[in-house]
Amino acid sequence: MPDFSIENEISKSINKKNCIIVGVDEVGYGSLAGPVVSAASFFLRHDNEIIYNIKDSKKLTPKKRIEVYNTITSIVKWSIGFADVYEIDQHNILNATHLAMQRALNGLNCDIDYVIVDGNKVPDLPWNRKAIVDGDNISVSIAAASIIAKVTRDKLMETLHTQYPEYQWNKNKGYGTKHHLESLYKYGKTIHHRNTFAPLPGITKLYSK
């Protein structure tokens, strides 16, 4: 279960009280449709009593994830950043993800002391930073960001599903499931599909109602 060990270690190393250590994570990296969404979050106090049930978003049921989301968004400072499909196709998914992370961090509007990012690559940022592999299972700040990003993107894909029900984005959230792929070949691609992601380059048919 994630805790404040990483945050406390960093706080001690920079020798500053009440420092702002921000966790960052993204959702939608491998999806065929929809934006990549990043969240940035930090806790105003490092109290282990407030982190019960905060886990990597992938380890929570949808119902539990919503419950935890409602709790953590009331006790953390947080922000969301998006990179849309056009930016993904233009800049590639890694650079677009880093762009979304930068936007999420800028949205906090505060003096950040340190940034910790889930994964093995960290974007070029104007703050001290480090990447932490499996960070959403280690750092509670990253785990909180993971949940916020996941719930935000899921809600968006569920909304898009109402416009394009053929692709079942309410279920697959834009990822390449069997049904999604079959629907792509049957109905064509939409403006929300990533044209640089296989098999999209080979699909010329465009969606029309």
Swiss-Prot record:
It catalyses: Endonucleolytic cleavage to 5'-phosphomonoester. Its main location: cytoplasm. Keywords: Cytoplasm, Endonuclease, Hydrolase, Manganese, Metal-binding, Nuclease. Its cofactor is Mn(2+); Mg(2+). GO terms for cellular component: cytoplasm; ribonuclease H2 complex. One of its GO terms (molecular function) is RNA binding. It comes from the Bacteria. NCBIfam families: PRK00015.1-3. Endonuclease that specifically degrades the RNA of RNA-DNA hybrids. PANTHER family: RIBONUCLEASE H2 SUBUNIT A (PTHR10954), RIBONUCLEASE HII (PTHR10954:SF18). This is Ribonuclease HII.
